[in-house]
Amino acid sequence: MGKEPRHGRVTVFALLLPLFVLSFSSARKGSVLPENIAGEEWPYYGHDAGGMRYSPLTQINRENVSTLKVAWTFHTRDISEGRGDRKRSGFETTPLLVDGTLYLTTPFNRVIALDPETGTQRWAYDPRIELDGDYGDGLVNRGAATWLDSARSSGQRCRRRIFESTQDARLVAIDAGSGAACADFGKGGQVSLSDVSGYHAGWYHMTSPPAVIDDLVIVGSAIDDNHRVDMARGVLRAYDARTGTLRWSWHPIALNQPSAAANANAKTFRSGAGNAWSIMAVDPERDLIFVPTGSASPDYYGGLRPGDDKWANSVVALRARTGEVAWGFQLVHHDLWDFDSASPPLLTTLRHDGKDVPVVIQGNKAGLLYVLNRDTGKPVFPVEERPVPQSDVPGEVTSPTQPFPLAPPPLAAETLSAEGAWGPTPEDREACRKTIAQLRNEGIFTPPSLKGTLMVPGNIGGMTWSGYAFDPRHSLLVTNTNNIVALARLIPRAKYAQRGSHAEDGDYGDQTGAPYGLYRRFLQSPSDLPCSAPPWGVLTAIDMTEGKIGWQVPLGSMQDFGGVHKQQIPAGSISLGGPIVTAGGVVFIAGTTDSCIRGFDIETGKELWKATSS
């Protein structure tokens, strides 16, 4: 989404005096900062190891944010519009700021070091990925990780390393000072990540930065959806940060699932994925890694993977030294909706029932937010198992219940009736009503069907990889969410093979090995606008002491998509870029379809500042 410049440039804004820079990309900071990390730096994807995306700096605040101006712009020129065999690029990186240098990754997986005050390039490293690869996410890289080798002296090469996991399945180590490969890591500075069962070039790739804890660098994987039943398994691997030696590996979905098979008349369990494609959080004090996982394959039919599919669609705490499971909590049982635990886990401490409780906060694409005790995995706010609609598809065995948190409230719509359909004209509304009336529609967790099912929310609804930020002074969690619905229909194998010229606009998934193929699309009117009522994107602040919404405002605008109906399009845009919060009382967020970055008042949600990125 967005215009071409969004895919290849970094824009930095600054107050005129004193000079203080703020990256345009969605950066993140921590709440309770580790004592050894200066507040001026941004050494992790989420600023601190727990991913709180909170800046303790106050130079930019509610009183002066309106004076922010562009300080400099750097063009990476790594742009693809998706022509020929090359996929479209997306510029989604979060830069790191360490030791006076800004490090960013590009859609082509180059790593670039910049002077943060001037934007001057210091060096660039090119892993030379296969740019025409069949990457399901397009050409995307969301950032890098850094590690300081305490065994090496200051000035020694590769004392500080930059780690990047690439789309063609490699882990590379780079000297932070020069941009040269760290030759003692793996073979010539890299380790191959393609040695997994079911590997398929392009379908198995990496988009998120590794996690670093102690002397380990840990990588998950992005695995394409809906190609076949037995996709590559979503293994998590920990490597020695100095040598690249594999220290341990963990599979979210075990190959042997005896209880699941017994509960479904001893069916053979066939599946893959369940992978950790998003960003992880680490807690060095507890020796824990917090891993968010996605759905098992294929996403929309689970007849060959009976049971809950643990630990897919979960947040799992692993012991960093061994990779052993400390605890796990599953957010969705037997997922049939692509409701991944897409958001990064966020680690903080909340005041609850008169006590300070260390927590991990985990959201998903269903728009549900779970608050768990970091030591035990037990819910801090109650979670109840509720009955959900059951499948009528032959061969499918649906979970009878799903876990619903009682607080915070759902952050995405869970129902849409035909009468509630939206459109800018009467003709649009009627077309949406007719489509919805023909679908199976029982609200959230209505399973895919042969007639077609309304997915509320759709698979980019709720919270995505962009995550949320936490302000410890106000105990407010801020997140952007999407309110978009979709249609999903299973097609019997013989009919799917014959679809040919009868194919509809939308996405098809082969789901090879399953008795059904998949058809899905976002539900839109003839004017190409969502059938769900606006706002289609909101920014919400949640009081995490009570688990209640503090404020909620529409985020961005989609008027540019309105054509002749532009003036009838309300505020609120689909967004795929998350917020940061500052001690100056400002929430910054970009990622909307109108190509703007905005600043909001943390206490009220009032928009204080806006600038375009194009």
Where are these regions (language model features)?
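Bacterial N-terminal signal peptides that target proteins for export
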Residues: 2-13
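Bacterial N-terminal signal peptides
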Residues: 13-23
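N-terminal pre-domain segments of enzymes
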Residues: 24-58, 399-429, 433, 499, ...
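Mature N-terminal segment immediately following signal peptide/propeptide cleavage
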Residues: 30-79, 94-97, 539-540
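Repeat-blade elements of multi-bladed beta-propeller folds
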Residues: 42-46, 88-108, 136-170, 202-228, ...
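Short aromatic-glycine motifs in intrinsically disordered, low-complexity regions
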Residues: 52-60, 169-176, 456-457, 527-529, ...
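Extracytoplasmic/lumenal domain signature
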Residues: 66-79, 111-135, 148-153, 171-201, ...
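Long, low-complexity segments enriched in small/aliphatic residues
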Residues: 402, 407-486, 493-495, 538-541
